[in-house]
Structure formats: structure tokens, C-alpha cells
Amino acid sequence: MGDKEGACFMKIAKYLDKALEYLSILALVIMISLVFFNSVLRYFFDSGIAFSEEFSRICFVYMISFGIILVAKDKAHLTVDIIIPALPEQYRKIVLIVANICVLIAMIFIAYGALQLMSLTYTQQMPATGISSSFLYLAAVISAVSYFFIVMFSMIKDYKESSDK
């Protein structure tokens, strides 16, 4: 990939990052607003917004899904690394490669399972919103596939950097 393609790819990645950040914030704001206003309406008027619980759940699921992608991109997930820093450099690389391969396998299982759940619930609609139930499982597919590619590209980048040394 040349400099021009690399710069174009980085620009697209930057826009996608910003879009995911804004979508996550939007989902959080909508979720909090719906829950708050629904609680106020139920407390004062003994009736609430019919679709607020379902739509809040959708917002929560997608907010988490987008957050998974954003955190994976920055390698900012919580990790327990008591043993890894104590290992010699050559073993540390092997352990990290094995861990990344395990993550890739897990993402394949998650994406496959979520696709199966999507196909099973495709015809079911949520009662208040009428949105297909499979829409919730789409978030798992999106985050698992995105996480898979982020880890894969990270492994390729790490390999290229280590082979350049």
C-alpha cells in the first residue's frame, strides 16, 4: 500500500472513529433521556412512554457494541498481565500471539452464534417498537467482526514491526 492509499485509509479510519464516538454518545443520551422521562411520567402521571424500555435496551446494546470497537482500536481493554511482563521478550511475544489467536477464535464463535440468533429471531418483532428482534443481535455481529479485524490488523502490524527490527 502506497503513501496515498495509506493516508486515505487513515482519513477514513479517523472519520469512522468519530462516527462511532458520536453514535455512542447519542445512544447514551437517548437511553438516559428515555429512562429519566419515563420514570418522571410514571411517578407523576401513572403512565409512561410505551416504547422507552425497548428503545433504551437497543441504545444500550449498540452503545456497548460501539464502545467495544473503540476500546479495541486503542488496545485499552482491561487486561490482567501479572505474568506477561515477567517473561523474557521471546516468550512474551509467543504468549501475546497465542492470546490474540484465542481472541480471534472467540470472535468467530461470537459472530457465528449471533448470526444464528439473528436468523432465529428475524421474524419476531419487539412488541412496543415493532423492530425485528434480530436487530439486537446485529450489534454482536458488528462488534465481533470489527474486533476480529482490529486484532488481525494489529497482529499483522506487530509482525511487520518486529520483522523490520
Curated annotation (Swiss-Prot):
* GO MF: transmembrane transporter activity
Q: Does the keyword Transmembrane helix apply?
A: yes
The protein's location, in the record's own words, is: Cell inner membrane
Q: How does it sit in the membrane?
A: Multi-pass membrane protein
Task: Please name the InterPro entries in this protein's record.
Answer: DctQ, TRAP_DctQ
What UniProt keywords are attached to this protein's entry? Cell inner membrane, Cell membrane, Membrane, Transmembrane, Transmembrane helix, Transport
For the keyword Cell membrane, the answer is yes
GO CC terms in record: plasma membrane
| GO terms, biological process | C4-dicarboxylate transport
Where would you find the membrane-spanning parts of this chain? 20-40, 51-71, 94-114, 136-156
Q: Which family does it belong to?
A: Belongs to the TRAP transporter small permease family.
- For this entry, the protein name equals Putative TRAP transporter small permease protein HI_0051
Species, as recorded: Haemophilus influenzae (strain ATCC 51907 / DSM 11121 / KW20 / Rd)
